[in-house]
Amino acid sequence: MPKSKVRKKNDFTVKPVSRTPVKVKVGPSSVWFVALFIGLMLIGLVWLMVFQLAAVGSQAPAALNWMAQLGPWNYAIAFAFMITGLLLTMRWH
């Protein structure tokens, strides 16, 4: 009786599935986006400077009387502009 051939055993291992996130390639941000977040940060800075230099005290001009009436809310408004601009920088490519 003829002898049968012995087949080589291939060790087949299942490769683990790669679960690494795929980064989506995004193009560069447009010019208006950069101007927007820089503008928001500058508006906040100017708001804070105008409040500190011109709208505080009894010598405040009549045009800035409304700003003096806001009182400490001026800090919140100025920092809200600046933080919004800062948060937009995180979306900049």
Swiss-Prot record:
It is a multi-pass membrane protein. InterPro entries: CrgA. Keywords: Cell cycle, Cell division, Cell membrane, Membrane, Transmembrane, Transmembrane helix. The chain crosses the membrane at residues 31-51, 70-90. Disulfide bonds: none annotated. Its main location: membrane. One of its GO terms (biological process) is cell division. The keyword Transcription does not apply. It is found in: Cell membrane. It comes from the Bacteria. One of its GO terms (cellular component) is plasma membrane. Involved in cell division. Belongs to the CrgA family. This is Cell division protein CrgA.
